[in-house]
Amino acid sequence: MSEYRLEMRDVVKTFPGVKALNHAQLKLKPGTVHALMGENGAGKSTLMKCMFGIYHMDEGKVIYEGQEVQIKGPLDALNRGIAMVHQELQPIPERSIGENIYVGRYPTKKYGPVTVIDHDKMYADAAKVLKEVHLNYDPHAKLGTLSVSQMQLVEIAKAVSADCKVLILDEPTSSLTAAEVEALFTIVDELRAKGVSIVYISHKMDEILRISDEVTIMRDGHYIGTWDAKELTTDKIITQMVGR
């Protein structure tokens, strides 16, 4: 049995005129926070979008729980237990918080010969997952009544609702207040303790050194290396990111 829950091996992804990923790699252990770092354009988000099925790799392999898998799209990734909280939020503000948490995978029930959304179960489950991530929000309330930072925390609740084994957080604190950052770190610590593998993308060195167990650095689409976070300093990270 591999010590890794998920491996991305030799991933190549080319867009017109640019090789965004050039044999990139990442190895995630259970119950760890793995920071993914690099300058803008290093390929971090592209690699994660390949993991989550938004992009399809030109070359490379994804090994998940010991098996090579083909992730066909985001819903396939979610069904496998891989969730992603994007830097660019895609909320549906006119829908309820509960509907946003379960969009695309609503619980259903039979009403005679017809299959319909089971709203009672959806809202009960949404209330449970909101409580699990310490959010005191009414799942029936419209998402649009929340601030941008509160919507970001709902996205994390959405990921947790999928009972994820791998959680990708792409710049998760970009719109959060200091108190909300602390709330996020509490959630991350609890998920790590439950064995979830967390990928944490951030440019904030203090966050990386505080929350991470391992750090992988990318540069110009290439894998540079992986370090134990305890071995790193801000200067060493910057040196590896810029290559000089």
Question: Language-model segments: which ranges?
Answer:
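Glycine-rich phosphate-binding loops of nucleotide-dependent enzymes
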Residues: 2-244
